[in-house]
A protein has these predicted regions:
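Membrane-interfacial loop-to-transmembrane alpha-helix junctions, especially the N-terminal start
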Residues: 129-141, 184-197, 256-282, 299-303, ...
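Aromatic-rich transmembrane-lumenal/periplasmic boundary elements in polytopic membrane proteins
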Residues: 2-89, 211, 215, 429-443
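Signature aromatic-anchored transmembrane alpha helix within multi-pass, membrane-resident enzymes
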Residues: 1, 138, 189-201, 277-285, ...
Length: 560
């Protein structure tokens, strides 16, 4: 769910392609897309439509732009909605790609902290040396500081959310060690979190002292996300998470666990919270979310509010629970709450200087995807592996009654399986379309990243004020401005004969599609200037110097 799954926008792209070739169409709400997909597959299997064409005309780029610009919004730059599979498939080696394994490691170590601290609980120590375990808990603080501190310099966007998640792990760990939530546990957890934060900076102080931060403030966002667009990106994960939360919410707020009995054959027992006030609050919040969603302005914020209310309720139960699983559930709820907070946060604020809110949504939505992918997988496992029906209950109920009371469970499982299948649409269609979308589609599969140069040329094309070199496939090798096979020869010569890492001097290209840094890219040597816009955007304090280095004239033209 973290690394392989695609979003529902990817399914929408497939539906659009199938709709073009489908002989069946209907305007009935909710059924139109399904009818078109069935008709499209019929045309492929039994008609004249080509499955090959269906695959290779698939728009693999579109799922990374799942959000639309709402009417009346001033900024018209579409936010980026990458997910890890798309990121690795696109293979653009930006910082967010490098940060993914480190971010997941931070979450994993956070869970390790919770489990390690749980073993410090005298009830669960099982004869282990408590002092040694306490020392190891401080070692985990150091490990967290090292990983989270590294994230700040690998991809600074990842630092705040995973610092918060790591702090939550330390506080939950102290609660696990105490066996219950106390002021002492909270104080020690906050103290260890502060130590971790200081260490995360101190361990990389040499980098911090030589680093200039171009963007360091936020501003109010003038863009918001339509709730439907939000669900087209996170819908699969949210469905799985919702089932997990609703089950645990029922255990918390009901006096009689009728949902648990129906789904899992659990025993009836009373709970301390009054059902009516809590249910009234949730219904009111849900109605507000639906109302806000109809105006396409505050739907995501309202969803976050409803979700946070539910998380607080289920977390409150685990704070009081003496069971050994309570700390793990608390950590999972902390991950869920962090994702809700990030989702609502980008609706209200954006990084000052961002292109609209393109990168703010991009980076924080990617965090939400990684965090919620773990929560969804855990929730699915928890519902169907941990909370299975009790055999004694099923024997008493009999075959027919057992099937009836488990019907909701089967329905949830069926929908979950369907959504998991839809999550694989992008890995299949997106991968094949992306591989086909290259300079020379006739090339066989290869690990040689330079193979395209044997049959690809570049030529100048007009783009605004700049003459941009763009690559194109030309099997004849006649019409191109420059044949890249000669560039390949030069690259191979540098690789074989040049020692060290001397700076490569090559023509500046203002567009990232211009291959302007191709020699530096394929040799690994430093260049004088990269893609002009990226350089100016990421070094905004030194924009004039970057422009001068790139040979930029006043008036926007580039000197060749």
């Amino acid at each position: 769910l973290v690394l392989i799954a695609g979003n529902l926008r990817a399914v929408g792209v497939l539906e659009e392609n199938l709709n073009k070739i489908s002989p069946w169409h209907t305007d009935v709400p909710l059924l139109g897309g399904l009818v078109a997909m069935v008709g499209g597959f019929k045309a492929v299997i039994f008609g004249d439509a080509s499955f090959h064409r269906l695959v290779y005309t698939y728009d693999w780029w579109a799922p990374s732009r799942a959000l639309s610009i709402l009417p009346g919004q001033r900024n018209t730059v579409t936010p980026i909605t990458e997910f890890p599979f798309w990121t690795f498939l696109f293979a653009d080696l930006h910082a967010h790609l490098y940060a993914i394994p480190f971010s997941m490691t931070a979450a994993g170590v956070g869970l390790g902290v919770v489990l390690n601290f749980s073993r410090l609980n005298p009830a669960g120590a099982a004869g282990e040396h408590v002092r040694a375990r306490e020392i190891s808990s401080w070692a985990m603080v150091f490990v967290l500081a090292l990983i989270v501190g590294a994230l700040r310099w690998i991809n600074s966007w990842d630092y705040p959310p995973f610092l918060l998640l790591s702090a939550a792990a330390l506080i939950i760990g102290e609660r696990a060690k105490e066996g219950r939530f106390t002021l002492r546990a909270l104080s020690i957890g906050v103290m260890k979190s502060a130590v971790m934060g200081v260490l995360s900076y101190a361990l990389f102080a040499n980098i911090a002292s030589n680093y200039s931060q171009a963007y360091s403030s936020v501003e109010r966002s003038d863009q918001t996300t339509a709730l439907g667009d939000y669900l087209s990106h996170f819908g699969i994960l949210l469905f799985l998470i919702t089932g997990f939360v609703l089950f645990n919410l029922n255990r918390t707020i009901t006096r009689t666990n009728w949902v648990r009995t129906m789904f899992f054959g659990g025993a009836r027992r009373r709970q301390p919270l009054q059902t009516l006030p809590v249910m009234a609050a949730l219904v009111t919040a849900a109605a507000t979310m639906i109302w806000a969603g109809t105006f396409e302005r505050w739907g995501v914020i309202a969803l976050g509010g409803v979700g946070l209310i539910a998380v607080i309720l289920v977390a409150a139960r685990e704070l009081r629970s003496p069971t050994p699983t309570a700390p793990v559930l608390l950590f999972v709820y902390a991950m869920l709450a962090l994702g809700l907070g990030l989702s609502a946060g980008v609706e209200m604020f954006t990084l000052e200087g961002d292109v609209g809110r393109m990168n703010t949504v991009f980076k924080f939505y990617l965090h939400v995807w990684m965090i919620w992918g773990v929560v969804a997988a855990f929730g699915l496992w928890y519902l169907f592996a941990v909370m299975r029906p009790q055999e004694a209950f099923l024997r008493r109920a009999g075959a027919i009654n057992a099937s009836i009371v488990q019907a909701p469970r089967y329905a949830f499982a069926a929908i979950a399986l369907l959504l998991l299948a839809l999550a694989l649409v992008y890995p299949y269609f997106g991968t094949r379309a992306r591989i086909h979308n290259r300079f020379d589609p006739s090339l066989a599969s290869t690990n040689d990243g330079l193979a395209f140069m044997n049959s690809t040329n570049i030529r100048p094309e007009s783009s605004g004020h700049d003459n941009v070199y763009s690559a194109h496939y030309d099997a004849t090798g006649v019409n191109g401005e420059h044949e890249l096979r000669y560039t390949r020869d030069g690259i191979n010569w540098i690789r074989e004969h040049v020692q060290g890492t001397p700076t490569i001097m090559e023509a500046n290209g203002p567009s990232y599609r211009s291959l302007g840094n191709r020699v530096a890219i394929y040799t690994g040597n430093p260049a004088v200037s990269g893609w002009q816009f990226h350089q100016e955007q990421q070094r905004v304090k030194f924009g004039a110097a970057v422009g001068a280095r790139a040979g930029k004239r006043h008036g926007g033209a580039s000197r060749r």
